[in-house]
């Protein structure tokens, strides 16, 4: 017989089912994670809620994969188990928090009674403290909630999902085993979660818009600089419209790659201080007004803090404030302000932008060199990429090399420039490729170094298991290149064991389901790029790209030198 509380419910539903139906509502179709005894019963609810269980090789990789999935899909979910599982994932969650990536982290916990009694259970620290792990997550989550009471479980779930979306950062939900089947009111599901941004105060917003327009109309050579938070806080439509209406020269920071249509007439390239193309650097740094949208001024995003633009010439647009020169307007999100700026802009005088293309530099065109170098390869990559590709680059040479690639339209760029956890890109590739498959099978391309690959290569197994077909290029240059440029060029700690990389998928049960390649010359890579079969991505493909150990993009060398000097 149902208890009194259940009989009072109009549409009783189990907490786990309610949670997973809410995930489906906000667009999640696949859930990453690793099964554990405290989350197993909850996983039984996934199929009936229209959700696919991915099943990763470990929780860290699952967290990276959820991150990649969220960057393509908009939001992601991760399920781990208490203690050992959630702590394995915590590095990935910290990276998502750092880089504004929305992940709903669901942690299966022991029975509420066991927690109350302080039992000495497995996966605990042996001290009866069952809050210690959720406390660890508080600093890297917008909100943490324990679903240990039917009275407010639905409210906590809805609020957490809304906070995750609005702030574009992870949230943490603890689900004790005894609460999985507890009944709550399912009638709430008829009302979708409100994911709309809180409106700005109209009077304040209008004032900020007037101030922005005053400086913009007074400027002689203004430019637009777009960065990562324009992507994360979903103002790309406003950015596109601002570019169209104003015609202003538009540049992106490294973390902003993919935010702007790079085939647009106003696109001028990547600005990263001294790591920039000279023409880009000159135009940005000589501008008398920079409209900076969603900036993250980290060391790797600015080529070692080498920006030469003053706050006196800058208007910063962010998700929670707008700063005009040295005056800050808090509690004013950029989405509403940008929309009104676009509507009221009128005529603006715009300078032409530097010509950016994927043409090879002259010294590379005329070279008889057959070794594959970064200066030669990245423009070639730009020529090979297709519209709507998803391009993932690992921390290291790939992250910096991609600056020299002009994307076709519709490309999504994924990297982890701020958090910079090596190995991230392999897990992110699995999640991104899965989201792409759900959306219609956009091509997913990964560039990763041989050193970084060794941290997370198990996710190639997950790619095979889920029938994903990314093209994975592995830069084989005998170890940790960016670390060599920072410190210890010839030291053994920057070396790695050489692997037969193109043969790895066989060990993961992928025999006959993938293709492996090894290229050591420019002619070989050019021939591979020209192959229609290869470029159509019919299956998972793994390419060893052998490059000189001493070679690196110029921007990496500049940034590494700055990092080395700060470490002394």
UniProtKB/Swiss-Prot annotation:
GO terms for cellular component: cytosol; nucleus. It comes from the Eukaryota. GO terms for biological process: aromatic amino acid family catabolic process to alcohol via Ehrlich pathway. It catalyses: a 2-oxocarboxylate + H(+) = an aldehyde + CO2; pyruvate + H(+) = acetaldehyde + CO2. Coiled coil: none annotated. The keyword Zinc does not apply. Thiamine diphosphate binds at residues 397, 420-422, 451-452, 477-482. Binds 1 Mg(2+) per subunit. Mg(2+) binds at residues 450, 477, 479. The keyword Cell wall biogenesis/degradation does not apply. Its EC number is 4.1.1.1. Its cofactor is Mg(2+); thiamine diphosphate. Transmembrane segments: none annotated. SUPFAM superfamilies: DHS-like NAD/FAD-binding domain, Thiamin diphosphate-binding fold (THDP-binding). Keywords: Decarboxylase, Lyase, Magnesium, Metal-binding, Thiamine pyrophosphate. One of its GO terms (molecular function) is thiamine pyrophosphate binding. Pyruvate binds at residues 37, 123, 483. Homotetramer. Belongs to the TPP enzyme family. This is Pyruvate decarboxylase. The lineage of its organism: Eukaryota, Fungi, Dikarya, Ascomycota, Pezizomycotina. The gene is pdcA.
């Amino acid at each position: 017989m149902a208890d009194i509380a259940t009989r009072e419910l109009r549409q009783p539903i189990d907490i786990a089912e309610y949670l997973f139906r809410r995930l489906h509502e906000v667009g999640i179709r696949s859930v990453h994670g690793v099964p554990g005894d405290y989350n197993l019963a909850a996983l039984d609810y996934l199929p009936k809620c229209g959700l696919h269980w991915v099943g990763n090789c470990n929780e860290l990789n699952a967290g990276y994969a959820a991150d990649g999935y969220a960057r393509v899909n908009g939001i992601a979910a991760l399920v781990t188990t208490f203690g050992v599982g959630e702590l394995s994932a915590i590095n990935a969650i910290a990276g998502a928090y750092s880089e504004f990536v929305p992940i709903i982290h669901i942690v299966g916990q022991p029975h509420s009674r066991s927690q109350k009694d302080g039992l000495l259970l497995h996966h605990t620290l042996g001290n009866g403290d069952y809050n210690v792990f959720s406390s660890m997550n508080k600093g890297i989550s917008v909100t943490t909630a324990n679903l240990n009471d039917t009275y407010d479980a639905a409210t906590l779930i809805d609020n957490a999902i809304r906070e995750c979306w609005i702030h574009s950062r992870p949230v943490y939900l603890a689900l004790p085993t005894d609460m999985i089947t507890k009944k709550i009111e399912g009638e709430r599901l008829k009302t979708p979660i409100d994911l709309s941004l809180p409106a700005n105060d109209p009077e304040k917003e209008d004032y900020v818009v007037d101030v922005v327009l005053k400086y913009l109309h007074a400027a002689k050579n203004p430019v637009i600089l777009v960065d990562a938070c324009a992507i994360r806080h979903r103002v790309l439509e406003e950015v596109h419209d601002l570019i169209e209406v104003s015609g202003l020269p538009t540049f992106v920071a490294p973390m902003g790659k993919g935010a702007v249509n790079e085939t647009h007439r106003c696109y001028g390239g990547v600005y990263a201080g001294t790591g920039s193309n000279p023409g880009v650097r000159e135009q940005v740094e000589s501008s008398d007004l920079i409209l900076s949208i969603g900036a993250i001024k980290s060391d790797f995003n600015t080529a070692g803090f080498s920006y030469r633009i003053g706050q006196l010439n800058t208007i910063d647009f962010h998700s929670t404030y707008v700063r005009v020169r040295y005056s800050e307007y808090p509690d004013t999100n950029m989405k509403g302000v940008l929309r009104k700026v676009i509507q009221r802009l009128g005529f603006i005088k715009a300078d032409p932008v530097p010509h950016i293309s994927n043409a090879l530099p002259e010294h590379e065109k005329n070279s008889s060199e057959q070794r594959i170098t970064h200066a030669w390869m990245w423009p070639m990559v730009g020529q090979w990429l297709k519209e709507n590709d998803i391009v993932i680059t690992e921390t290291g040479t790939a992250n910096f090399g991609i600056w020299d690639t002009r994307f076709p339209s519709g490309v999504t760029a994924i990297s982890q420039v701020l958090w910079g956890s090596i190995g991230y890109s392999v897990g992110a590739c699995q999640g991104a490729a899965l989201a792409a498959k759900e959306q219609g099978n956009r091509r997913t391309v990964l560039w990763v170094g041989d050193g970084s690959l060794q941290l997370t290569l198990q996710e190639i197994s997950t790619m095979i298991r889920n029938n994903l077909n990314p093209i994975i290029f592995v830069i084989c240059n005998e170890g940790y290149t960016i670390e060599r440029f920072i410190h210890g060029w010839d030291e053994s700690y920057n070396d790695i064991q050489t692997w037969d990389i193109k043969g790895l998928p066989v060990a993961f049960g992928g025999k006959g389901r993938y293709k492996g390649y090894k290229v050591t010359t420019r002619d070989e890579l050019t021939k591979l790029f020209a192959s229609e079969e290869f470029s159509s991505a019919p299956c998972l493909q793994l390419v060893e790209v052998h490059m000189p150990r001493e070679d690196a993009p110029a921007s990496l060398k500049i940034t590494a030198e700055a990092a080395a000097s700060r470490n002394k």
